[in-house]
Regions:
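Structural transition elements
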Residues: 22, 293, 323, 327-359, ...
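N-terminal lobe/hinge region of extracytoplasmic solute-binding protein
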Residues: 35-88, 119, 201-207
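A structural "hinge/loop" feature
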Residues: 38-55, 80, 107, 131, ...
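Detector for C-terminal structural segments
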Residues: 56, 214, 218, 311-339, ...
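Gly/Pro-rich hinge or "lid" segments in bacterial periplasmic/extracellular proteins
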Residues: 69-71, 170-232, 236, 351, ...
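Aromatic- and charge-enriched surface segment that lines or borders ligand/interaction sites
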Residues: 82-128, 149, 155-157, 165, ...
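Surface-exposed binding/hinge segments that line
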Residues: 96, 133-187
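Ligand-site clamp/hinge motif
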Residues: 196, 224-270, 395
Length: 530
């Protein structure tokens, strides 16, 4: 089963380093205070958001059919669905909905809410909809395939047979959160199914309800007294926008915040030797990547793509900027999952890059605009690449800022960021990096990094990815993923992966039960404080 392959990447392996004492904390015992960077938060609609910071908030405002506990995310557990069955042909999943669950509005949660929510995700067609659309659900068929048969039963019928765990993992993702359909019907504006309302409000049944959110300032969530698993210990959670690492560190050391989430490697290293702090490092399923737009006649040259792989300072970054934020990984499936290759064939080699550029017809290099997210560690990695590229004759005009929209619309030359695939399975990564069924601009497959990069993925690779997702025999599936890994690496893909994503957080020793989560579902209702 997938479970045995996921142990290395389960959030249970969060690494904690306990350290000596600092000033006494000042945050109230019944409140949790988080320091984050809100610059990428564009709203709180679970069927629209696609960022780590928003996802953690959504994970606590809403519930899902399936629970993926941090201690072992490889084994799906009952959530809003207290039980489920899978038909003999593997295509029909029948979920029994838990009774007694209330939304924050006071409305009871029923199978009709589940039906409406999953249909809404598909019909909105935004980036998170890929999580269901990849299994064959469309706006045209979803009403037939996802249906409530009574007040406590929901049937999810897949058009084709897929590995059952893929469907269950999907229904545990934050994108498949269940919304209060009756309440949102009152908030509908022009048929938007409550989308405008949910930018700054919630309609969930999770352990916390949203009190207020001021963008790039402060979010406040209150414990939900009628939460079906019991009222949380933390009466309130405050999420503060503190973009500077040094400011996060000072407030954590001074006891003004309990958790700091975007610290530089320098500040994390200092905390290792100087404070009463725990450093959590949670390996995830995403990558730090460099995207080379294949619409560009220069960047679409395979030798140019290969040259970029020799301009990343893997070793230097591993010991500095990426010490807390990534694990060197140049192949497409992370360690611990079936199909992972035990090899990292590239190293920083400017002369090799020059040779490849000459063979490609660019002995004097070229100039390109390079967009990078201006947060740690992404920007430091981008600056390193810019310096190494210059040595090979490539002039990169590095521009910080929020350019994710340009990436999604394929309006860029070079772009780098980090991804966070949400299923503990190779398919989650391969779906984004190695499938692109329609490479036209009109296809708008914005949830796929391969489409965003305008890469016409070789048919051989795409066919194997599809076959592996359908395969129910785990041994055969692992063999297929090994072949995919080799073929992907040999193709010199325009998505240059360098480090497996690791999420690093610094947590006050007063805080217990705050657990990093590989799929961004960190829960606040498990938290207590000394």
């Amino acid at each position: 089963m997938i479970r045995r392959h996921c142990l290395m990447l389960s959030s249970a392996i969060v690494l904690s380093i306990a350290l000596p004492a600092i000033a006494s904390s000042t945050t109230p015992k019944d409140q949790l205070v988080l320091a984050i960077t809100m610059s990428s938060m564009r709203g709180l609609d679970p069927h629209e958001i696609n960022q780590l910071e928003s996802a953690e908030v959504v994970a606590n405002l809403y519930e899902r059919l399936i629970a993926l506990p941090a201690e072992n995310i490889a084994e799906p557990k009952p959530g809003l669905a207290e039980s489920w069955t899978v038909s003999a042909d593997g295509k029909t999943f029948t979920f029994k909905i838990r009774s007694g669950v209330k939304f924050h509005s006071g409305n009871p949660l029923t199978a009709k809410d589940v039906e409406w929510s999953l249909r809404r995700l598909v019909k909105l067609g935004l980036a998170p909809s890929t999580d269901l659309r990849q299994w064959g659900f469309t706006a045209e068929n979803v009403e037939k395939l996802i249906r409530a048969t009574d007040s406590s039963t929901v049937v999810v019928e897949t058009p084709e047979v897929w590995n059952a765990n893929l469907i269950l993992f999907t229904l545990g993702s934050f994108s498949t959160s269940i919304l209060d359909s009756k309440f949102l019907a009152e908030k509908d504006k022009g048929g938007d199914m409550g989308r405008e309302y949910l930018q700054t409000a919630d309609a969930g049944s999770g352990p916390y309800s949203l009190r207020s959110w001021r963008a790039n300032e402060l979010l406040i969530a209150d414990a939900f007294k009628d939460y079906w698993q019991g009222e949380p210990k933390m009466r309130r959670v405050l999420v503060r926008h503190i973009p500077e690492s040094s400011a996060q560190r000072l407030q954590l050391e001074g006891g003004d915040v309990d958790v700091a989430t975007r610290l530089s490697s320098t500040d994390l290293a200092a905390l290792e030797t100087g404070g009463e702090i725990k450093i959590q490092k949670t390996p995830g399923f995403g990558y730090y990547y460099i995207a080379l737009n294949q619409k560009d006649p220069i960047l679409s040259n395979q030798k140019v793509r290969e040259a970029f792989r020799y301009l990343v300072d893997y070793e230097g970054l591993s010991s500095t900027v990426m010490k807390y934020y990534g694990i060197k990984q140049q192949t497409i499936i992370p360690p611990g999952l079936p199909g992972a290759l035990d090899k990292n064939p590239y190293k920083l080699d400017v002369d090799k890059a020059k040779q490849l550029l000459t063979e490609a017809g660019y002995p004097n290099g070229f100039s390109k605009v390079y967009y990078a997210t201006p947060v740690t560690p992404e920007y430091e990695v981008a600056q390193s690449l810019q310096a190494n590229a210059a040595k090979a004759g490539i002039k990169l005009d590095l521009q910080g800022g929020d350019h994710i929209g340009k990436f999604r619309n394929r309006e860029f030359e070079i772009f780098s960021a980090r991804s966070g695939e949400r299923l503990p399975d190779p398919h989650a990564i391969l779906q984004s990096y190695a499938t692109n069924a329609n490479n036209s601009d009109e296809a708008k497959l914005t949830g796929l990094n391969a489409w965003r990069t305008a890469w016409a993925v070789p048919k051989e690779i795409q066919d194997m990815v599809t076959a592996a997702a359908h395969e129910t025999d785990q041994s055969k599936r692992a063999d297929l993923y090994m072949k995919i890994s080799e073929a992907y690496l040999a193709s010199s893909p325009p998505l240059v992966t360098s480090f497996q994503r690791t999420d690093a957080k610094a947590v006050s020793s007063r805080v217990k039960g705050y657990l990093g989560h590989s799929t961004w579902l960190t829960r606040w209702d498990t938290v207590t404080k000394d």
